[in-house]
Amino acid sequence: MVVSEEGKWPEEERWERYTSDKISRLLNTFPGVQNIKTNWSQSMQDMFVLTMHYGKRNGTYLEIGADQPRIINNTYLLESEFDWTGVSLEFDSDKVEFFNSVRKNKCICHDATTFDYVNLFEERNYPKQIDYLSLDIEPPEQTLKALSRMPHDVRFSVITFETDLYDTLRRNDGKSQVQSKSEEILLSYGYQRVVKNVASQGQPYEDWWIDPTVIDPHIVQKFVLSLCSYGHINYPYSNDMKIEGARCIIR
């Protein structure tokens, strides 16, 4: 792989990745993890998804805000190593063209806040229970709009939602309206937040959710207890809580 082809390779200190030599440091394992050489998400979202699904193969996803096809992408590992299928959305046409030259699962160039998701799911015969929803566009208010457009009769087993809380804190605006509104929406649909304020370089920017009606509660409990046992988080959540994404996966 030519790094310069994407121009997005972060400095090593800004991107802690899982690599196969860290397998003994995993807080939780799953079938197939021994075959993973490295992950690709910014904060190990891909590893979180696989942990919650216990290494599920042939899963389904919807990715809102694809950006790059591999570097800091939440679905490349799922597609390339676990045979997941899905579709990504991206507003930048140049990024979409490059994405589609690299990936098997394709990316659509469209505004995620006006896109017809009902038609997409019908055309592609998506199941009513989709395994993963990744929501990450700029600014976070747009991410919230995209969430609001999701069909009510379709559920997602795992959701990663970018709040960009650090930006709110930087502006001293107090509580993030995007975070509180997304909480309101997802809680009203019966979703459960597993990790609040996932951070990168100390900057909290994302919340991780699951559908408790389909994700094994024993997996969730084990995941949460492993975080608590290493002092990474405390329950109940405090308003100033944050946790580096990598600490959710490796000790």
Predicted regions span which residues?
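Conserved acidic-Pro-Pro-aromatic motif
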Residues: 76-77, 82-85, 128-135, 139-250
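Helix N-cap/coil-helix junction residues
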Residues: 54, 91, 126-127, 154
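Juxtamembrane luminal stem/stalk of type II transmembrane Golgi/ER carbohydrate-processing enzymes
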Residues: 1-44, 224-251
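Short amphipathic alpha-helices and their capping/turn segments at secondary-structure boundaries
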Residues: 50-51, 122, 146-151
